[in-house]
Amino acid sequence: MNLLIPAAGIGRRMGGSRNKLLLTLLGKSLLSWTLEAAVKSDHITWIGIIGQPIDFPDFQKNISDLSTDKHIELIEGGATRQESVYNGLQALPSAAERVLIHDGARCLATPELLDRCAVEILKCPGIIASVPVKDTIKVVDPSGIIQDTPNRRNLWAAQTPQGFDVKLLKECHKKGQILGWEVTDDAALFEKCGLPVKILEGEETNLKVTTPLDLKIAEFILLKAL
């Protein structure tokens, strides 16, 4: 299975100007934790890290610290996550039929989750790891007045990995470019093209490290697991 890791983001909500995936968590970068899970996965054989060239020396050091014979490639990203994933799709091996896409900032994803996603994507054109929403969600108008309270049983919080048929996802990206779609994940492109995306239950601990508080929570979770 092929895995693309978007890793081009700047951690502005972290209060810094550097790539947040280079921040340290228990002595290792966030990217290193993500890569370790990918390397331990039984199904992942090819890994592409999508980032900016300025970060490549640091990424290469993270790769060098790993003990693996899996192919890991550095791919230049774009101005947005959407553009970066598109670049990653072009860099996939020519024989690639399926791909998993996993945010590098979700550094607590387990090898088991990656493997479950790798198996499930062979059965359908699109999958997304998600967890049931526990909070009551309110839909509000621009002035902050509640308009609706959706049934919580129908709500899932999207995570990654997300998995797709490579040919279909490339077509969705091209259509999105032509029509000017701006989306925050690849499942949304599939949805806009009328293609099915199946929910696969993710992991409660698979949080996205976005703020300093997230970093503290991730540290707590790792200390409990080690």
UniProtKB/Swiss-Prot annotation:
It is an enzyme of class 2 (transferase). It catalyses: 2-C-methyl-D-erythritol 4-phosphate + CTP + H(+) = 4-CDP-2-C-methyl-D-erythritol + diphosphate. The keyword Nucleotidyltransferase applies. One of its GO terms (biological process) is isopentenyl diphosphate biosynthetic process, methylerythritol 4-phosphate pathway. Pathway: Isoprenoid biosynthesis; isopentenyl diphosphate biosynthesis via DXP pathway; isopentenyl diphosphate from 1-deoxy-D-xylulose 5-phosphate: step 2/6. CDD domains: CDP-ME_synthetase. The record marks 13, 20 as: Transition state stabilizer. SUPFAM superfamilies: Nucleotide-diphospho-sugar transferases. The record marks 152, 208 as: Positions MEP for the nucleophilic attack. Keywords: Isoprene biosynthesis, Nucleotidyltransferase, Transferase. Its EC number is 2.7.7.60. Catalyzes the formation of 4-diphosphocytidyl-2-C-methyl-D-erythritol from CTP and 2-C-methyl-D-erythritol 4-phosphate (MEP). NCBIfam families: ispD. This is 2-C-methyl-D-erythritol 4-phosphate cytidylyltransferase. It comes from Trichodesmium erythraeum (strain IMS101). The gene is ispD.
